[in-house]
Each structure stands twice: as structure tokens, then as C-alpha cells.
């Protein structure tokens, strides 16, 4: 939660109208003693006496000392008017955002027919937000009433809750925010702008979960796991490198600002590292959208998408670890080895705990959908799936973990296991539901970014810091991509080309996650400067890099129009035959374990556990195996169309055309006499809507006359060497 800002003071007195927002009022009889208000005073640090008419931010409490009845009636009338006015203003504010989303959708529809070469719809959504924010800030003014503002309260601290004594009655006010000294006469305007500024927790609890979940739920796992090692390197090592490079450069800028007298508040090295973690969260949603439309090379798409998905999770955990850095002693901003290792331990603990919680929630959902008959009631099934998925984020946050990591891995688990248990209608519903929520949330955030540039009231723009930040993010991205790509190419058969590296460098846009991390805490001078600079970075990268994506693809000669399923057809035969060797033994073991044990345990798919578990586990196997598994034993159903391709020597059929990858009869004896492990491996290869299952079952697919029948695999499989 954002820590409360201190109330601004002027000449030793507290200007209460700068820091207090009326949320509720409590009236007590005049005869009550101060001692009886002790518990209430524990949440309030001061009690102030006011004249008979007092107001904060448009709240007017008319107090008539002549009679209690008249005074009560006046208060009720004023309260009703205020409630009605507040309701109308809140409705108008929500209407603004609805109209922004509507305008964005119409613009996207227009772009479907006439594409703007150097402008993407996300950038245009930000422009719409900027225009609306400009109008709200400078075009609309609320008439001010000087009688509704009282400046006579004096306190010596900045309490979260304030009890105010007004003619013997006590009213409760809560801290809302700081108002700068030059805005004292615009209290009503400030309140209007504050109402269109959402609580930062809205982003984390409402808008981010569907975005992150959909990233995991729609993950193309075949290409993701092919490049998993590279993706993990970019996401973990790359983000850490970027964070420390940016933090070090920004610390130099801050030191320069101190020397030149440009720094008006405290800014420590830990703040610089926190800023590095915030802006290290890449969000190339604009670039990926263009990649998807142009069907860019699937390897590049997988690297960028996988990095951005895990990078967000790493960045938020890294920022939490930096905030938790607490060296021993009085100075909490010095370097301490013990505290550093403690922060590393916190990072590992939070990440692993969040991962476990997300996976566990997915497993629970698997069992609920497997052993109940919810599939007969599609509405209930979809509702349960939605609530269980969303609750993962809140559960992780409530337990002190990171909801972003938890909901990401929950989405991956739900897609791989729970999806197979859902009815066909619920499968379509869940995909469409989260796709819609992701679309609305992303566009809302980009529109809100533009709005915030004018409605946020505590911006701190420093030219030195801004210029240093832009230099730092470019150098940090370069230190992430190029050295790691060089090291990864040493162990990759399919090299990451220089054009791919340049494109990945170019595609390091900042977006929703960086904005959400920056706006979550703007209590201090340093945090306010971070937020303002992050906002400018997001604008620049989305407009310039997002708009220049098409031109950069052409300049770097990167393939477009590539079918992700048939991309392997252009690969030479010798490279295709080495695909099996490229697959890491760890993932081959995982696939075997997943197919034979996890999928039968969690879903209706896969072989029954009674055939894979030892005989001594028979009762448990029969209990955990669903009846559908026995029905599907001869024709295993796997809706996951994105598994790793391990073999390139099997004839596959796409629609009405057959692809000849290798002679099955010539290669089968050689392949199946290798090791007993490979003999027992059950291969499930899926391309598009056509599934090929090899498990000793005779399969007949449309073949050309020149091709050997696919069922010859069954014969050669059991033929002697």
C-alpha cells in the first residue's frame, strides 16, 4: 500500500485542506469526554477546534448553535446534496473512461481497414488520454467557495486519521494527499482531478490479473519450450543485469544533480536500483501485436513473448526485494553484504512461493473440474474457472507473495491441464472471456497513462534525470541482449542472428507493468520523480519504437508471413533429423513424466494410472483415474497443440496435402532400436487441428500415392533389428 504523504506545513501550521479527505463523519453528544474517545484518538493524532462552519474539499457542515433540531436538518440537507453531487461526478468520471475505450475500439476497427504505418492503436489510445487529461486540467474549473475552506488547524504530525472538534461535535477526516503551496486556492479543481486518478491498487488487483493470466493461458508452449533456456536467461539474468546497469547510471546522474543543486529531496542508491527494476519491466505489446499480424518468424516471436512474460514477473519480485533491503545500523541506505544476501533470499523465496501457489491453485481447479460434473453446467464451470484463476492473484498478495508470478503460472497450469477437463463450450468461453478482459484492461491502462500526465498532481520532472534515464534504459537493454545472445549462441544449434538481436534490442518497450510499479508508491520526492520519468519513457518507447516496428523489420530483413505450424518445412533434412538431439534430456524426461503420470492424475487425458503406476498402487490408481480416461485409452485426446517437436522423420498431413519429412520405413528400425526409454516414449504431435498419436495404435491418414502408409510405423516398430 502507498504510504501516506505528510501534510504540508506553512509557518509551523498545518494546512489541513491540503491533506484531508472527508470519508465519513461521526457525531457525538457534547457531553462526551475526551477520555472516552481514547480508542478513536489512537487512529488520529490530533483534535482541532473550528468555527461553527467548516469544510474540507467541498464538504460543508453547517452547524447552527441556536438549536439542535435545525442544525441536524441543515446537516442532512447538505449531506444529501453532497452525496448526489458526488454520485454525479463519479458517474461522469467513469463515463469518460468508457468513452475513451469506445473511441479506442472504433480506432482499432478503422486501423483494420487502413493501417497507419507509423502509429499503432495503443499509441493512439495514449494520445486520446492526453487530450482528455489536457481538457480536465486546463479546460474545466470548479467554482471555489472560500467559505468552505478553513485554515486554522495546527498539528505537529501527519496522522492518517484526524478527529475534528466542531462546536462540541467530532468529525473524522482521513489523509488523502499533499497539495503544493501554489495550488491552495484550487482545492475544488484538485479534488476533481483526484477523482479521475485511480487508487494504484486498482491496477494491481483489477487490471493486471487478466493481462498476466491471459499471457500464460494463451502461451504457445511448443515454441516457448523450444527456447526455454534462452528465455530464462533473458528474463532472469538479463533483467538483473539491466536493473544494475540502469541503477548505476542513475546513481551517477543523481550524484551530478546533488553537486549542481538540482535535487530537492533525498535520493539514495537503493532508490536508483528500484528505478532500474521498474523500467527493466518490458512490455512489447505493440510490437507483438504487429508481429502477430505480419506473422513474423516464430523463433523471434517466441523469444520476445517469452522474455516479456517472465520479465514482468522477475521485475516485480526484484523491486520487492530491493524495497526489503534493510542493512543493520542506523543508516538504511549503506551497502551491507548480509542485507544483500538477505534480499537475494527474499527474491528466491517470493518467486518460488508465488510459483508454487499459482501451480497449486491450478491443480486444485484441475481436480474440481475432473471429479465433479460441472461440465454439464457450462455457466457454472466457466464461473468457477474464472473465480479460481482470479483468486490466485489475491491469495498470493494476501500471503505476502507476488500475485503477478502466481497468476502467470496458474494460467500456464490451467491451459495445460484444466483446459482438457472443461466442456467444449467452456473451453471457448474461457478463452474468449480472458481475451476480452485482456483487451479492455490493456487499452484502459494505455488511455489512463495519457490522462495521468495531466491529472497526477505531484509530478517531478528533472531534465538531467530524464535524459540520464533514457540513456540508461538503452545501455541496460544492450547489456541484456548482446552479451547474453553471444553466450547463448555457444550452445544453440539454431543461432540467434544479429538481426534478431537488433530487433530484440529495438523491441524493449515499456508499458503497463512499468507504469503500475511506478504509480504504486508516489509518497516521496524520489518516487514522484521515478513515476514522472517512467511515464515519459513509456510514451517515447510506445510511440517511437512501436511505430517504427514495421520499418525496422524491413530494414533488418526479418521474415514475415511465416506459418507457425509449417515453419519447419523450410528446414533442411539434416537439421530436422537433429531436432531430437537438440531437445534437452531434462525436458524429454519431463514430457514422459507429464504424459504418463501428471496428465492422467489431473485430467481425463493420457493413459489410465492403472497402466502406468506399479501394481502396488492399484487402489490409489483406480481412485484417481477418471472413467473418461478408460474410454479414451485407445484414442488419447490432447488439446495442447503446442508441445515440443522431438522427431522430424514422421509423415504429417496438413489439410489435404501431405508433407514428406522422411521415409518412415527406412528410418523406423534405426530409430526404435536405440534405447528402451525412447521405445517407451509416447509421442503426441499436434499441428493445427490435426492430431497424430503414436501408441501402438493403427492410424490411417490421407496420404499421397507416392508415400508409404503411415501405419507401417506399427510394423517397423516391432520388427527385429
Swiss-Prot record:
Keyword Cell membrane: yes
Keyword Ion transport: yes
Annotated keywords: Antiport, Cell membrane, Endosome, Glycoprotein, Ion transport, Isopeptide bond, Membrane, Sodium, Sodium transport, Transmembrane, Transmembrane helix, Transport, Ubl conjugation
Catalysed reactions, semicolon-separated: Na(+)(in) + H(+)(out) = Na(+)(out) + H(+)(in); K(+)(in) + H(+)(out) = K(+)(out) + H(+)(in)
PTM per Swiss-Prot/TrEMBL: Ubiquitinated (in vitro).
TM helices/strands, residue ranges: 91-111, 123-143, 196-216, 231-251, 272-292, 298-318, 344-364, 388-412, 434-454, 456-476, 499-519, 535-555
Subcellular localization, as worded in the UniProt entry: Endosome membrane; Recycling endosome membrane; Early endosome membrane; Late endosome membrane
UniProt membrane topology term: Multi-pass membrane protein
Ranges for region Disordered: 1-44
Cross-referenced Gene3D superfamilies: 6.10.140.1330
Cystine crosslinks: none
Highest taxon in the source lineage: Eukaryota
Knockout mutant characteristics: Mutant mice generated by CRISPR-Cas9-mediated gene editing display an early neurodegeneration of the cerebellum and a more protracted timewise degeneration of structures within the cerebrum. In both the cerebellum and cerebrum, lysosome deficiency is an early pathogenic event, preceding autophagic dysfunction. In aged rat SLC9A6-null brain show deposition of amyloid-beta and tau.
Family: Belongs to the monovalent cation:proton antiporter 1 (CPA1) transporter (TC 2.A.36) family.
Quaternary organization: Homodimer. Interacts with RACK1; regulates the distribution of SLC9A6 between endosomes and the plasma membrane.
Protein name (record): Sodium/hydrogen exchanger 6
Organism expressing this protein natively: Rattus norvegicus
Amino acid at each position: 500500500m502507498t504510504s501516506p504523504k505528510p501534510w504540508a506545513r506553512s509557518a509551523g501550521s498545518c494546512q489541513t485542506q491540503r491533506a484531508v479527505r472527508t470519508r465519513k463523519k461521526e457525531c457525538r453528544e457534547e457531553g462526551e469526554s475526551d477520555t472516552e474517545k481514547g480508542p478513536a484518538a489512537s487512529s488520529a493524532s490530533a483534535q482541532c477546534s473550528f468555527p461553527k462552519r467548516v469544510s474540507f474539499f467541498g464538504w460543508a457542515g453547517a452547524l447552527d448553535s441556536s438549536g439542535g433540531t435545525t442544525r441536524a436538518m441543515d446537516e442532512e440537507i447538505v449531506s444529501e446534496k453532497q452525496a448526489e453531487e458526488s454520485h454525479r461526478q463519479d458517474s461522469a468520471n467513469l463515463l469518460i473512461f468508457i468513452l475513451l475505450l469506445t473511441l479506442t475500439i472504433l480506432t482499432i476497427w478503422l486501423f483494420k481497414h487502413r493501417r497507419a504505418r507509423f502509429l499503432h492503436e495503443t499509441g493512439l489510445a495514449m494520445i486520446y488520454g492526453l487530450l482528455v487529461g489536457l481538457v480536465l486540467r486546463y479546460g474545466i474549473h470548479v467554482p471555489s467557495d472560500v467559505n468552505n475552506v478553513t485554515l486554522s488547524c495546527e498539528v505537529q504530525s501527519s496522522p492518517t486519521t484526524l478527529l475534528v472538534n466542531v462546536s462540541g461535535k467530532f468529525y473524522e477526516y482521513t489523509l488523502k494527499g499533499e497539495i503544493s503551496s501554489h495550488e491552495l486556492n484550487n482545492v475544488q479543481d484538485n479534488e476533481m482531478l483526484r477523482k479521475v486518478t485511480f487508487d494504484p491498487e486498482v491496477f494491481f488487483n483489477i487490471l493486471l490479473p487478466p493481462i498476466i493470466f491471459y499471457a500464460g493461458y494463451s502461451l504457445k508452449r511448443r515454441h516457448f519450450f523450444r527456447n526455454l533456456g534462452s528465455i530464462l536467461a533473458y528474463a532472469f539474468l538479463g533483467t538483473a543485469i539491466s536493473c544494475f546497469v540502469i541503477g548505476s547510471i542513475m546513481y551517477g546522474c543523481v550524484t551530478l544533480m546533488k553537486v549542481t543543486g538540482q535535487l530537492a529531496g533525498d535520493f539514495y542508491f537503493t532508490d536508483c536500483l528500484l528505478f532500474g527494476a521498474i523500467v527493466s519491466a518490458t512490455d512489447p505489446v505493440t510490437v507483438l501485436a504487429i508481429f502477430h499480424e505480419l506473422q513474423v518468424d516464430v523463433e523471434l516471436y517466441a523469444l520476445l513473448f517469452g522474455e516479456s512474460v517472465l520479465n514482468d514477473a522477475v521485475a516485480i519480485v526484484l523491486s520487492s526485494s530491493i524495497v526489503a533491503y534493510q542493512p543493520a545500523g542506523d543508516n538504511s541506505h549503506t551497502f551491507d553484504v548480509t542485507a544483500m544476501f538477505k534480499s537475494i533470499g527474499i527474491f528466491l523465496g517470493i518467486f518460488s512461493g508465488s510459483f508454487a501457489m499459482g501451480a497449486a491453485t491450478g491443480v486444485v481447479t484441475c481436480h474440481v473440474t475432473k471429479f465433479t460434473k460441472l461440465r454439464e453446467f457450462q455457466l457454472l464451470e466457466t464461473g468457477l474457472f474464472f473465480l479460481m484463476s482470479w483468486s490466485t492473484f489475491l491469495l498470493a498478495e494476501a500471503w505476502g507473495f507476488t500475485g503477478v508470478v502466481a497468476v502467470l503460472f496458474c494460467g500456464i497450469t490451467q491451459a495445460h491441464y484444466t483446459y482438457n477437463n472443461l466442456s467444449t463450450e467452456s473451453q471457448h468461453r474461457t478463452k474468449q472471456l480472458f481475451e476480452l478482459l485482456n483487451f479492455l484492461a490493456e487499452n484502459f491502462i494505455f488511455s489512463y497513462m495519457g490522462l495521468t500526465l495531466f491529472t497526477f498532481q505531484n509530478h517531478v520532472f528533472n531534465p538531467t534525470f530524464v535524459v540520464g534515464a533514457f540513456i540508461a534504459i538503452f545501455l541496460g537493454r544492450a547489456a541484456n541482449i548482446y552479451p547474453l545472445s553471444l553466450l547463448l549462441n555457444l550452445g544453440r544449434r539454431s543461432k540467434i542472428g544479429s538481426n534478431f538481436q537488433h530487433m530484440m534490442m529495438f523491441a524493449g518497450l515499456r508499458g503497463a507493468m512499468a507504469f503500475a510499479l511506478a504509480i504504486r508508491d508516489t509518497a516521496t520526492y524520489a518516487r514522484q520523480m521515478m513515476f514522472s520519468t517512467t511515464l515519459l519513457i513509456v510514451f517515447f518507447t510506445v510511440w517511437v519504437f512501436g511505430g517504427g516496428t514495421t520499418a525496422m523489420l524491413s530494414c533488418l530483413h526479418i521474415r514475415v508471413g511465416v506459418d507457425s505450424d509449417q515453419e519447419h518445412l523450410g528446414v533442411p533434412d539434416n537439421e530436422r533429423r537433429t531436432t531430437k538431439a537438440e531437445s534437452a534430456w531434462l525436458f524429454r524426461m519431463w514430457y514422459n513424466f507429464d504424459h504418463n503420470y501428471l496428465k492422467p492424475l489431473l485430467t481425463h487425458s493420457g493413459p489410465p494410472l492403472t497402466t502406468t503406476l506399479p501394481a502396488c498402487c492399484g487402489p490409489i490408481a483406480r481412485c484417481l483415474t477418471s472413467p473418461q480416461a478408460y474410454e479414451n485409452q485407445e484414442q488419447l485426446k490432447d488439446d495442447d497443440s503446442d508441445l515440443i517437436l522431438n522427431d522430424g522423420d514422421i509423415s504429417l498431413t496438413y489439410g489435404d496435402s501431405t508433407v514428406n519429412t522422411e521415409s518412415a520405413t527406412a528410418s523406423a528400425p534405426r530409430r526404435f532400436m536405440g534405447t528402451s526409454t525412447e521405445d517407451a516414449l509416447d509421442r503426441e504431435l499436434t499441428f493445427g487441428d490435426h492430431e497424430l498419436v503414436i501408441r501402438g495404435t493403427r492410424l490411417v491418414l490421407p496420404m499421397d500415392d507416392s508415400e508409404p502408409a503411415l501405419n507401417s510405423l506399427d510394423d517397423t516398430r516391432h520388427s527385429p533389428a
